[in-house]
Amino acid sequence: MGFHIYEIKARQIIDSRGNPTVEADVILEDGTCGRSAVPSGASTGINEAVELRDGDKSVYMGKGVLKAIENIKNIIAPELEGMSALNQVAIDRKMLELDGTPTKEKLGANAILAVSMATAKAAAKYLGLKVYQYLGAYKANILPTPMCNIINGGAHSDNSVDFQEFMIMPVGAKTFSEAIRMAVEVFHTLKGILNGKGYATSVGDEGGFAPNLKSNEEACEMIIEAIKKAGYEPGKDIAIALDPATSELYDPKTKKYVLKWSTKEELTSEQMVEYWSKWVEKYPIISIEDGMAEEDWDGWKKLTDKIGHKIQLVGDDLFVTNTSFLKKGIEMGVANSILIKVNQIGTLTETFEAVEMAKKAGYTAIVSHRSGETEDTTIADLVVALGTGQIKTGSLSRTDRIAKYNQLIRIEEELETTAEYHGKNVFYSIKQKQIKSL
């Protein structure tokens, strides 16, 4: 028949931060090969699936992944060889059974995910389909509104900005290609503004600029200036999205948020909610990810009650792409969106289950990269297959980020007249869809 798995290979390669990661090849009986490499995060949720590292400080500073690779070769491969690559659910469930732990700590989520994604790519190639067509079938025609990271702070840079990501979303574009053009123009305009003010234009892990700004507010003000100077209207054409990654700022002992890179100010949950409420009134912000810490469920509830009808509130560390945590959030009325990171959960099957649960509850879903990426473009196909309408995959620089955007441009071209770009209409979880304009 040809579609059964004949062999699985695995190797240690290097990601965009110079750290080792896992790449797997799934080879079918007829010689068809699917290859995939897994990403890695810098700021990680405490409930994420475990990324297995070797821990030998004398090799790659302890970040080697040879244990994960051995698990693929010695445990996963013997069980999967002979199985049908066309049954993704069976493949993923077999690996979950082999691991047997809630966080995949035995085999490593990096081992499991590499094989899961490579299997899907092999199956698609065997059937003569693109990955997005194979995974999404007839529904795979929505191109995502991108969240483009243009200023980095926090754990993704070495500057005085507390919040990790300041992003732009071209909500007024008519096509994905136009959205990328708009974002690129703002990116280059911002570079000119930073140069003019004497700020460095070096970039962080995700390709955004990492200037040593005077305050967190200055980042928003610079972005608004760049949007206007590029010829667009803030809010109407291009909105701002934030990922403050506040779990990195939260002290669970004092239950306070410490703005440790800027003012050293300590804020209670209530004060943090008010902080974001004022920002939403002041700036054209449409989305805030991890506006409260993952342990601070009460704070999350207060934030959702306060501004959840106005903007998209995205749970990343809060939900870690896990249906158990998402279910809790839905029942509590916490957040209105989930960030989807395949390596947080570890298999494509579980990823699809999380998106399905979110959609049924009226939550939006955003497919996301990690700060440590590779040239693998699977998430570009995945976002179209899932039809979530939003992607977060870094800035308009660094090949590891651009590769995903370029793949989406190709997909849009392939879809021709059936391609859809929903722009600001992707925010179906918000009751009040009016984005503040300036």
Swiss-Prot record:
Q: How is the cofactor bound?
A: Binds a second Mg(2+) ion via substrate during catalysis.
Q: Is Metal-binding given among the entry's keywords?
A: yes
Instruction: Write out the pathway annotation from the protein's UniProt entry.
Output: Carbohydrate degradation; glycolysis; pyruvate from D-glyceraldehyde 3-phosphate: step 4/5
Keyword Transport found: no
- Tell me a GO cellular component: extracellular region
Q: What main location does UniProt list?
A: cytoplasm
Q: Name one GO molecular function term.
A: phosphopyruvate hydratase activity
Entry's SMART domains?
Enolase_C, Enolase_N
Q: Which residues bind (2R)-2-phosphoglycerate?
A: 164, 341, 370-371, 392
Catalytically driven reaction(s): (2R)-2-phosphoglycerate = phosphoenolpyruvate + H2O
The broad enzyme category this protein falls into is lyase
Residues binding Mg(2+) are 243, 289, 316
For this protein, the record's PANTHER family field holds: ENOLASE (PTHR11902:SF1)
**NCBIfam families from the xrefs?**
eno
Q: What does this protein do?
A: Catalyzes the reversible conversion of 2-phosphoglycerate (2-PG) into phosphoenolpyruvate (PEP). It is essential for the degradation of carbohydrates via glycolysis.
What is the name of this protein?
A: Enolase
| Source organism per UniProt | Borrelia garinii subsp. bavariensis (strain ATCC BAA-2496 / DSM 23469 / PBi) (Borreliella bavariensis)
Species lineage: Bacteria, Pseudomonadati, Spirochaetota, Spirochaetia, Spirochaetales
